[in-house]
Amino acid sequence: MAQPTFFTKPPATALADIATLTKALLVDPTRGDHVITGLASLDEAGPMHLAFFDNLKYADQLKATRAGACLVSPRFEAQVPAHVAVLRAAQPFRAFVRIAREWHGDALRPQSWVGNDGIAPSAIIDPTARLEDGVIVDPLAVIGADVEIGSGTVVGVGAVIGPGVKIGRDCNVGARTAIQCALIGNDVLIHPGCSIGQDGYGFIFFGPEGHLKVPQTGRVLIQNNVEVGAGTTIDRGSLRDTVIGEGTKIDNQVQIGHNVTIGRNCLLAAQIGLAGSLTIGDNVALGAKVGINNHLKIGDGAQVTAMSGVKDDIPPNGRWGGFFAKPTKQWFKEIIAVERLVRDSRADPKDEGRE
């Protein structure tokens, strides 16, 4: 449940109004005046909390819940205890998120950590930088020459914005983030500790002079409505730019190499490693700890299972997984075949007595 120490306390709201907000049906209208004061999980909810249920793994929690009301699909409605008011919704979690966004908008987009509403006295801003009205710069942030920052953007504590960087409106640059050689659109959320625009890993290896560094003279382009998780690193391009497409959501601790192009509305889970000059299409989903080799193409709509290693191009809408990754149906068949071989070898009487 939301802690009032960190987040705004929701307004006390009648169930009838919650049904309207969530577009759910209150099965027993006589409970419409019951007041809800917060959101909680099934196991932590009390009589004045709203919860949701959409996964049978939590059936025991539903049975024991003390929640005042529960969003649930018609399929599971009969399992809700009698003391819990039922809000019928085709997609319970989506309905729950709808009211969570209504009540906890402050959790969607971080603001100044220190309650700052302007330029902190300890911030260092080059006189050639251009900041629109309404920009917030927290203490100890550094903004370099010729930087442009749009209105509504928050630059966190200790963040460093290098010369010539352009950041759009209504963005958030997390504490201790470093940005250089980058152009960033509107509504971009960059969590703390990110590094954007640093050198890519470019060398001529094992030559007579050792490892010869290749100049990295490209940029990072981040389009509108992108989210970049904490501790993520995005290298600038060597010749062409590194591009993150509109609406893409990147989890924590992801490494994106130089010259990578990521399309629109992609999903990248934590600890992914993308090697250089990789092209990823639109609406691609990559599971946690996926590694993808350089110079590959991942087609629109492709999905890759967590902890897979990709060394080949993936066609549009491909479903791949494994190490090395291959179409998931083939991967599963091979796993079953290997398990069968192991099982059969153990049952072979010729193997008795062998080490």
From Swiss-Prot:
Keywords: Acyltransferase, Lipid A biosynthesis, Lipid biosynthesis, Lipid metabolism, Repeat, Transferase
GO cellular component, one term: membrane
Gene3D superfamilies the UniProt entry points to: Hexapeptide repeat proteins, MurE/MurF, N-terminal domain
Pathway(s) where this gene product acts: Bacterial outer membrane biogenesis; LPS lipid A biosynthesis
Enzyme class, first EC level, given as a word: transferase
InterPro entries, per the entry: Hexapep, Hexapep_transf_CS, LpxD, Trimer_LpxA-like_sf, UDP_GlcNAc_AcTrfase_non-rep
Disulfide topology: none
Active site: 258
Subunit details: Homotrimer.
Family per similarity comment: Belongs to the transferase hexapeptide repeat family. LpxD subfamily.
NCBIfam families given in the database record: lipid_A_lpxD (TIGR01853), PRK00892.1 (NF002060)
Name recorded for this polypeptide: UDP-3-O-acylglucosamine N-acyltransferase
Natural source organism: Bradyrhizobium diazoefficiens (strain JCM 10833 / BCRC 13528 / IAM 13628 / NBRC 14792 / USDA 110)
